[in-house]
């Protein structure tokens, strides 16, 4: 098992898999999820060194993973969090545990085995941008006119 809590010994239950993916999708599209994603993008863009670590929230040198970047931005004391406790991390960041697990999976496991911290930063930033819901200007204009 990994920090994400995902396991490789899937029992083939498509229904449970669909339920899990549905929870992840709802978490990412919800108000709290979108707020975290926007904060994450801002935190990533503000990083002086465009590098993301894996397997930890923050190192003693101050390097962070994707969720850790939000922790720095929001002033979360990450030394008190167990990076392998999805529920605890989710609570500290006001997101669903399914979202915490998915971000950790993307950060730690979705990239190539020999991925550099710089490449991880680039991949995660692109992924975060694809998950942020944008409202077309025309939709905002139509609402304010009507």
Task: Annotate each predicted stretch with a short phrase.
Residues 1-146:
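Short, glycine-biased loop/turn motifs at secondary-structure junctions and
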């Amino acid at each position: 098992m990994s920090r994400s809590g995902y396991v490789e010994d899937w029992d083939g239950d498509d229904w449970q898999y669909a339920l899990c993916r549905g929870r992840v999708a709802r978490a990412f599209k919800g108000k709290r999820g979108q707020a975290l994603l926007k904060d994450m993008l801002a935190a990533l863009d503000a990083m002086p060194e465009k590098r993301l670590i894996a397997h930890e929230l923050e190192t003693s040198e101050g390097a962070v993973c994707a969720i850790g970047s939000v922790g720095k931005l929001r002033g979360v004391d990450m030394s008190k969090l167990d990076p392998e406790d999805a529920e605890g991390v989710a609570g500290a960041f006001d997101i669903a545990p399914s979202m915490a697990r998915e971000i950790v999976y993307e950060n730690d496991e979705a990239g190539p085995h020999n991925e550099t911290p710089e490449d991880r930063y680039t991949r995660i930033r692109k992924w975060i941008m694809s998950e942020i819901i944008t409202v077309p200007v025309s939709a905002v204009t139509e609402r304010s006119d009507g």
